[in-house]
Structure formats: structure tokens, C-alpha cells
């Protein structure tokens, strides 16, 4: 790839000094096979620790009351980012932050438990493709 048309700044963000494209994918080689396992942008870096939003979402989805969840990072001065979870519960189900934290403590390392939890009354917004 030579770069983005008339956009040197965007080109510099995705090409390294040797011209390799930084796709944002995380993977590993196992013999001749390349396994793509995650995306860099799906990671929250909290005080130098990489946290997979997908891993935290999967743990939250294990709770019977959860209909939808979205985990993301929010800026934090000291640690860089902190985790936040937006959760929509199933109809007629109840869950509070303390109960969720206890539930997650059995499934995740302490630093992976969201610092902030927002319970949404309505389903979480989606883009046109879902």
C-alpha cells in the first residue's frame, strides 16, 4: 500500500517506517498457520494491563439477567483508561452493580471488572449492520 490518497496523516497512522500496514489485528503463528484472535481497538489499556472488551462482555453475558452489554474504555488521567459497561437487562430481571461485581469476581481478574456500570432501560443502540 502506497498510502491514503492526499492524506499523509492517515497514512502515517497505519504504515510503519518499513511500509508495513498496521491492520489492528492481534494474532499468533502456530507453525505455518496465522491465527487472528482479537483487535487492538477492542483492548482497553488500564495502567499498562491489556483488557479484552470481548472477554469482559462474555463474562457479563453469563449472568442470566443480562440481555445486552457493551464494554468500552473511558479516559482516566492516572491509568490511561478505565472500563465501563453499559448493560440492558432482560424483561422482569433485576441486577445491581454490587451483585454484578460479585458475579464477575468469580470469573475475571479484579483489574478486569468494570469500574463503572450503566444500566440502560432501552436496548443498546446499533449501527445499520447490527
Language model: regions and residue ranges:
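Short, glycine-anchored, charge-dense loop/turn motifs used at functional sites
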Residues: 32, 129-130
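AMP-binding/adenylate-forming catalytic domain of the ANL superfamily
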Residues: 109-129
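AMP-binding/adenylate-forming catalytic core of the ANL superfamily
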Residues: 2-3, 8-13, 18, 24-112
Amino acid at each position: 500500500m502506497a498510502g491514503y490518497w492526499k492524506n499523509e496523516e492517515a497514512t502515517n497512522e497505519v504504515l510503519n517506517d518499513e511500509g508495513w500496514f498496521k491492520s489492528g489485528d492481534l494474532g499468533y503463528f502456530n507453525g505455518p498457520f496465522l491465527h487472528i484472535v482479537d483487535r487492538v481497538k477492542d483492548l482497553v489499556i488500564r495502567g499498562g494491563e491489556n483488557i479484552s472488551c470481548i472477554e469482559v462482555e462474555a463474562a457479563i453475558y453469563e449472568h442470566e439477567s443480562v440481555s445486552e452489554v457493551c464494554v468500552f474504555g473511558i479516559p482516566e488521567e492516572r491509568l490511561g483508561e478505565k472500563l465501563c459497561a453499559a448493560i440492558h437487562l432482560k424483561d422482569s430481571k433485576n441486577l445491581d452493580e454490587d451483585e454484578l461485581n460479585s458475579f464477575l469476581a468469580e470469573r475475571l481478574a479484579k483489574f478486569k471488572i468494570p469500574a463503572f456500570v450503566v444500566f440502560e432501560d432501552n436496548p443498546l443502540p446499533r449501527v445499520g449492520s447490527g
